[in-house]
Amino acid sequence: MRVALVSALCLLTGVCAASNYRDIQRAVSDDQLLQSAGVTPADAQLRKPCSAAVVESDDPPEFFDCVYVQTEKDLNLFSLEDGYLMSELQLKLHNMDGVALQHMGRVSQVQIFSHDRVTALYIHDKSWIDTAQTESVYRWLTDHGVPAREPRSWIGP
């Protein structure tokens, strides 16, 4: 009985996670959702599905699926809640203290530093972390004036 219950819960969790990820994939290209979140679609230079965690002080990281939106002057992380994009983080480039690229095996993580907060993020492709796109976010930020700095140890799983 317990094995059946645990198996059912694991299956349900997997189905919910896959469903949320598909919803994020659709939200990435939805101009109307982006407009209602306060970003003009024409201003979005890059829109990608991602996972991120915003860590303050020594709190444990809590990753969430999100839409990464980059404009000329800022970056935005939006979660998808009840069919709407909700702002989890908005940072102007000039308010960033630095950015780092952390590697673990074949995957990369962008770490963005702003005051006492560190944001760790990965860009996703259709199946897993897209290291090339994650690294291109890092390069874009440094090319646009965000200072490079040493990364913290790997954040998250």
Which role fits each region the language model picked out?
Residues 61-110:
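Phosphoinositide-binding peripheral membrane targeting modules
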Residues 16-70:
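Anionic N-terminal interaction surfaces
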Residues 4-14:
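Bacterial N-terminal signal peptides
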Residues 98-157:
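Acidic, Ser/Thr- and proline-rich intrinsically disordered linker/docking segments
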